[in-house]
Amino acid sequence: MRFITAGESHGPELTAIIEGLPAGLPLSSEEINRELARRQGGYGRGGRMKIEKDQVRITSGIRHGKTLGSPVTLIVENKDWKNWTSVMSVEPVPEKQKKIRRVSKPRPGHADLVGGMKYQHDDLRNVLERSSARETTMRVAIGAVAKKLLAELDIQVAGHVAVLGGIEATIPENLTIREIQERSEQSAVRVLDPSVEEKMKELIDQTKKNGDTIGGVVEVLVGGVPAGLGSYVQWDRKLDAKIAQAVVSINAFKGAEFGIGFEMAQRPGSQVMDEIVWDESTGYTRTSNNLGGFEGGMTNGMPIIVRGVMKPIPTLYKPLQSVNIDTKEPYKASVERSDSTAVPAASVVCEAVVATEVAKAMLEKFDSDSFEQMKEAVKRYRLYTQNF
């Protein structure tokens, strides 16, 4: 499975094309829209969420509620487009109109300046329109398709906020994937620890008053994954590496870790490695999951646990020092409509990109023209690994 996305933040629409789905996978617009709505929720979101109520339009690859095996095209219209038709016009406009909403003061921490240098743009809007986190709309739409495929194969995905600003949530032990899903959905900040929810909301409110932004850490878990996805034989076939790339590709994400992550550096090996046991009813399992479900770049049958760190959003209502690219004089950076934090929403995006990589790995290992054939292949493989 592969995909491509297109579209600008204030253009007419966002588009995604997914290729490589088997025929016969049940899929509806409603399932995708449900995930899009989750992305637009979360405490701390800005004014655009009141403007955009994202709805997907499927224009190819699905008939009567099932995939056809041909490319699937997803389109999400930008409701705010009517206010940007001249600024974002595809056709040439008079020089005077080009200056409307032109951006010449790059924002520190954003793609503005380097993107302008790279592509020789004298209007940095040409950079920020595509580098905007609005693109994650389509990553979530694609992730919704991936989640549907995984759910049909008894693989569940859940995400939550682990850290917001300087506030760290206590994560209850032994929760099922479904329990994590339910608890995070009940929280305005998608946290599993009710004792810190109000503190997080207060921090978000104060940060907004200060004209500042805050980042955090999100965690995604994937349960029911069979052992053996990915491979150790080449560096670029390791699934944990692919997931790490996907996580860091999310706007404003700067790092990823698996299991107990960087804490491994502070422990001896005897307190890191997950001991192997076997049971007739379940087959091979581990007594712990410090490695986050991976050994040698392959899934080992334990739940995948991955964390991503999101930096504070670089668009500040009290902008930092910058330089006008026309005059080279010091100026305060440009201000665009933005959020004080998007960490709760980012947990949904992180779920989506992780689900997409796991779905791609499943399709690679159990390559089938029809989804029914794929389900049978997965069933046989699970039985094989249990009795290995």
UniProtKB/Swiss-Prot annotation:
Gene Ontology CC terms: cytosol
Catalytic reactions on record: 5-O-(1-carboxyvinyl)-3-phosphoshikimate = chorismate + phosphate
Biological processes annotated in GO: amino acid biosynthetic process; aromatic amino acid family biosynthetic process; chorismate biosynthetic process
Pathway in which the depicted protein is active: Metabolic intermediate biosynthesis; chorismate biosynthesis; chorismate from D-erythrose 4-phosphate and phosphoenolpyruvate: step 7/7
InterPro entries, alphabetized: Chorismate_synth, Chorismate_synth_AroC_sf, Chorismate_synthase_CS
Region (Disordered): 95-115
List of residues binding FMN: 130-132, 251-252, 296, 311-315, 337
Amino-acid biosynthesis as UniProt keyword: yes
EC number(s) reported in the record: 4.2.3.5
Binding, NADP(+): 39, 45
Basic residues composition bias: residue spans: 98-108
Entries under Pfam families matching the protein: Chorismate_synt
Segments traversing the membrane: none
Cofactor note: Reduced FMN (FMNH(2)).
Cofactor(s) needed by this chain: FMNH2
Keywords of the record: Amino-acid biosynthesis, Aromatic amino acid biosynthesis, FAD, Flavoprotein, FMN, Lyase, NADP
A GO term for molecular function: FMN binding
Broadest EC class assigned to this enzyme: lyase
Transmembrane helix recorded as keyword: no
Function (record text): This reaction introduces a second double bond into the aromatic ring system.
Family according to the record: Belongs to the chorismate synthase family.
Quaternary structure and interacting proteins, as annotated: Homotetramer.
Protein name: Chorismate synthase
Gene source species: Enterococcus faecalis (strain ATCC 700802 / V583)
Gene: aroC
